[in-house]
Amino acid sequence: QKMIETKAPAFTELSEFASVSAGGKVVFATDDFFAPCEAMLADTEPIFITDKYTEFGKWMDGWETRRKRVTGHDWCILKLATKCVIRGLLLDTAFFTGNYAPKYSIQAACLTPEEDAQMPDRDGNRLGTSYNSCDLECVKQLDTDRWDEIVPVTPLRPGYDDTRLNYQKVVSDEAYTHIRVNIFPDGGIARLRVFGEAKAQAPPSDVMIDLVSLLSGATCQGYSNAHYGHPRNMIKPCKSETMADGWETARRLDRPDIIEANQDGTLKVPGEEWAVFKLGFPGKITQICVDTAHFKGNFPDSVKIEGAYLGYADWTPESKLVWQNILKPSKLSAHQDHWYDCTSDLVTHIRVTMAPDGGISRIRTYGYAVQPFLI
């Protein structure tokens, strides 16, 4: 059973796997005439520039195909950042008012590395083009039209402010690596987001990994403030491109009129902001990186990191636990990586606390996963 949502549903707090910064990418599209499919995965909010045109027509911030004058319908194949269970989607038609795709459906598959290697290479600017027969033949061999249907044919709404956001809950526990987005018959979509839970394969116990990475299956399970940017941005695998792609809080209203410092150099402030993450695997942390890239006039004064072991449980505000110190309050500076060696007990969760407020681009917690049968 599938449900259409009209307000931001709970699944939008989960990790996201289609956007460029998460590692999603387009591997095939039937048509990119007015606007290339890659723009649908952009991290930025869609914009509209009234007098901007290309040699092919009106510039649009999203994926837009030409008006169909041949049989069939348009579709594309996306590779997700990692294998995941899909819990919901957002299809944003912003500014596509007379040219949005009227209907869509979503199919999905879990491809082997060998099957993934059969996908065509998609390089260069595809604006003004359609598929070539060689690429289509590669995709046809994977029977994409027979993939699991996770969203049946469903109407889309036009890209006005009050109708642009089309949320779609998905009820399935299958894990997938690729999706096929069908639009009927043609038109445009500004942005696509895929929310869910990563299903990473446990690494060998002697291999160091980033335990809090999106690709390891880590998730954000709570936070105090996300006014300008969600804490889940910090666990994306790639370096951030802008300040918008990080965790940034509002300025705290309880900050002192005149700032003073503690003996260790950190500022005397009454408040702080926090975010809790469940690690991809239980593990022991040996090295931490806190990246303040792009945060130049709004980086936190200091950061501390604590850990806790909750077994298989998720963290909730009602969780009874004692947080153990992994990284004591440590000074931060603008627009750079901060590396710390550390030693932690076995932990399943971490709490990142900044004081008093500000922004952090990325956080990495390198260490070793502990297999469940060894716990």
Where are the predicted features?
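Generic structural detector for well-ordered beta-strands
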Residues: 79, 169, 276-278, 341, ...
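Short beta-strands within extracellular/lumenal beta-sheet-rich domains
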Residues: 69-80, 266-280
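Helix-boundary capping/turn motifs
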Residues: 78-84, 242-245, 278-283
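C-terminal, well-structured subdomains that either form a transmembrane helix-short loop-helix hairpin
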Residues: 274-294
